[in-house]
């Protein structure tokens, strides 16, 4: 939107939210709002022209809404992202202008690309982490095994883990590029730089990033399944029939059919095996912190999960 609010005002943000809060009510498709950004989206099919018409009708409705409330859209900044290889890539217009098609778009800090492989997002995260790691090395002449982990976990690792439940690298090259940042960081402590990566992690009490992504998947699954986040679990999982095996938990989920690698590595598919293999006492934890403690304890007893390296 072209409209804005004075920087630093107290009531400005609240008033702006009030002004745009009813925008989603004028459309029939899904519409998500964040500050002055709006996303309109829906599933489309090659032979379903109704979906094309539906999107255009909604765009026209938004334009009419903006004119009514004198909150004009900045059409030059409005883009169209078509996701999927079979997407018909229909053209849409706003105020008589054809919206520009893009291959990627940043959404809340995560670069979403048209094929959902997230190569650009991975490269962006690695670049930010590299810059942060470089600043640490320039700012501190000597780093010990206490200081480095603290700085790394505070300033570098967040860049590599922000939103990774969505974009977590599943291609070998991307995964190696992400892990390489931590490899370089752990060499910053004198006396252990010549040790193997696995041994450096043990000395610094750091898990591998791959292990943290796997653990993070389980934590998010737990939150969704148990209703600890404002997400409908039916949008993510199909629950399997009740299990009668002793020790089996009641929240087992079915694994959706996935042919393509991208689909196999989406969150709702990749978490199924790990989640279903968790014991009942872990899944039925009362709080998120209790779940974290129990899954760490459980995985620590399993040979395939015991080492986070």
Where are each of the predicted segments found?
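Short, conserved micro-motifs composed of acidic
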Residues: 47, 57, 71-105
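Catalytic palm subdomain of template-directed nucleic-acid polymerases
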Residues: 39-64
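Mobile genetic element proteins and their domesticated derivatives, centered on retroelements
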Residues: 8, 12, 23, 36-38, ...
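Short, conserved non-catalytic motifs in the polymerase core
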Residues: 1-15, 41-48, 99-101, 114-115, ...
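Extended, well-ordered alpha-helical segments in internal regulatory regions
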Residues: 155-170, 223-229
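Active-site palm subdomain of RNA-directed nucleic acid polymerases
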Residues: 13-42
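Short linear motifs embedded in intrinsically disordered, charge-biased segments
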Residues: 173-309
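Basic, alpha-helical interaction scaffolds
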Residues: 102-165
């Amino acid at each position: 939107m072209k409209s804005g609010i004075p920087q630093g005002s107290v009531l400005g943000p609240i008033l702006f939210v009030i002004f745009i809060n009813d925008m989603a009510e004028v459309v029939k498709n899904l519409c998500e709002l964040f500050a002055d950004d709006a996303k309109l989206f829906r599933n489309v099919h090659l032979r379903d022209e109704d979906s094309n018409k539906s999107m255009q009708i909604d765009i026209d409705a938004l334009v009419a809404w903006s004119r009514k409330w004198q909150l004009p859209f900045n059409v030059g900044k409005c883009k169209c992202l078509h996701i999927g290889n079979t997407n018909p890539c229909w053209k849409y217009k706003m105020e008589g202008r054809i919206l520009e098609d893009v291959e990627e778009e940043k959404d809340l800090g995560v670069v979403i690309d048209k094929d959902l492989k997230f190569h650009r997002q991975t490269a962006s995260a690695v670049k930010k982490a590299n810059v942060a790691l470089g600043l640490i090395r320039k700012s501190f002449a000597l780093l010990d095994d206490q200081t480095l982990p603290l700085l790394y976990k505070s300033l570098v690792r967040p860049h590599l883990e922000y939103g990774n439940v969505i974009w977590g690298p599943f291609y070998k090259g991307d995964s190696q590029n992400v892990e390489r940042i931590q490899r370089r960081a752990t060499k910053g402590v004198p006396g252990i730089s010549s040790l193997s990566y696995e041994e450096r992690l043990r000395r610094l009490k750091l898990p591998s990033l791959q292990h943290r992504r796997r653990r993070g998947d389980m934590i998010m699954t737990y939150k969704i399944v148990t209703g600890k986040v404002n997400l409908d679990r039916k949008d993510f999982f199909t629950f399997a029939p009740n299990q009668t095996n002793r020790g089996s938990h009641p929240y087992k989920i079915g694994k959706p059919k996935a042919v393509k690698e991208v689909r196999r590595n989406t969150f709702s598919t990749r978490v199924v095996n790990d989640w279903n293999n968790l014991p009942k006492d872990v899944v039925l934890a009362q709080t998120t912190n209790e779940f974290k403690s129990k899954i760490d304890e459980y995985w620590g007893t399993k040979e395939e999960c015991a080492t986070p390296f």
